[in-house]
Structures are given as structure tokens and as C-alpha cells.
Amino acid sequence: MALMFPRLARNFARNGYFPTDEVTLERALQALAPAPSGRMRICDPCAGEGVALAEAAHILGRDKVQALAVEYDRERADHARGLLERVLHSDLFDTMISRQSFGLLWLNPPYGDLVADHSGASQYQGSGRRRLEKAFYQRCLPLLQYGGVMVLIVPHYVLDDELTGWLSNHFTGLRIYAAADPTFKQVVIFGIRVRRQDLARADANQVRSRLQAIGAGQEKAEEIPAAWPW
């Protein structure tokens, strides 16, 4: 499946922004399937050029989804506006978005350490290493409905004890794959949001251990597949 929408010409990594390579993006998108009925709201809170969310809307059916993108960089936000109806050019941490509003959360957050003067630092709640990826995860998780799907794209080494604990307590059906292009050491994580009391604890612990091993470099995630069994 080739991408339908044009990418920004100068779409290169800078200032914590790391675009997903096209092969990984194509394969991750192929894992999505439209809901059998009704409309779905989908969100990319770190939308970059907007291509990932535009492609997701196309796959899920433009007439069946309402898409919201948030992007900090003006040039990328302007490009996204050419692909999507609703694009906020804003710092995500300055936005007010209703909780549990979305059935799909596509999250490829900025990568790097969370410095004290970052807008998300005052809202951060955690005891482990302070990372941008974790701050954006905390900010975005409440936006996703229970039963909704998250696609999270982060470097594997961010999967420390704290983040893997959050993931295994917030999601069921977690699957992790290595990006097709290893340049940024990214992994793609799929999960379905669930209430903690509904988790199978033994399964959650097993998944957490695997995520920790991949994060520590003790185990390698398999490459994201070119075809899915559904």
C-alpha cells in the first residue's frame, strides 16, 4: 500500500521531531480496520505534517471519521491543514481537549529528555527518568476512550520500568514491533485501552516483562509485518 498523501519536502528530524519512515507508516496503517458501524473520532496530538492521520482517516473511511490534529511547528501545521479539516497549531500542553473523546490515538511524540522549562514539565507525574515521550503519553492517554486503540511510536530505549508499567496497566492486547527503518531505533506499539480492574494480571505482567527486555536491549522486537492476518 503506497501512501495517498504528499509528505513535506523538508520533513527531517530536528528539535525532538522524528518522522516515521514511509514503510513503517504504511505497515502500521494496514493494521487498522474501520468500525462496523457509526462514526469514530481519531486524533494525532503530535501530528507533524499530518500524513499519518490523513492516511488513517482514508483507511477508516472519510465519511466515518472525524479527525483532529495538533502540531506545534507552524510549517508542519500548515502542511497538515492541506490534508485535514481540523488542525490546531498549538503547544499540546496549552490545549483543552475533552477526555475520552477519541477511538483512535496515533501518538509519535517528540523524543528526548524533559527539561525543566518545557511546557509539559509542570504537569509531569512520574518518578523515573523524565522524558518527553512519557510526558506526552501522560497528557494524551486521557483523550482515548476505553476500548479505543492506541498506536504509539517511540525509541525502544524509552521503555523503562515506569513506562512499561503504565502501558501494561492501561492497555490490553499489547503488540510491539520494530520499525522497518532502524535509524531512530523506533518501535510501534499497538494496544486497546482498558480499565485496570479488567486486566488479566498474569498476562499484563508477562507483557510488561517483554517490553522491559526490549527497552533494555536484551530482546529484539520483530520487524513490523508487511501483511496482517486479519
Map each language-model feature to its residues.
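S-adenosyl-L-methionine
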Residues: M1-S37, A52-A54
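Conserved class I S-adenosyl-L-methionine
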Residues: G38-G48
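Conserved SAM-binding loop of SAM-dependent methyltransferases across substrates and taxa
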Residues: E49-R62
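Conserved SAM-binding motif I beta-strand of class I
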Residues: Q66-E71
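Conserved SAM-binding loop
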Residues: A80-R81
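A short acidic, Gly/Pro-enriched loop at the edge of an enzyme's catalytic core
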Residues: M96-L104
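Conserved Class I SAM-dependent methyltransferase catalytic core
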Residues: G128-I192
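Flexible, glycine-/basic-rich loop-and-beta segments that form/coincide
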Residues: F184-W230
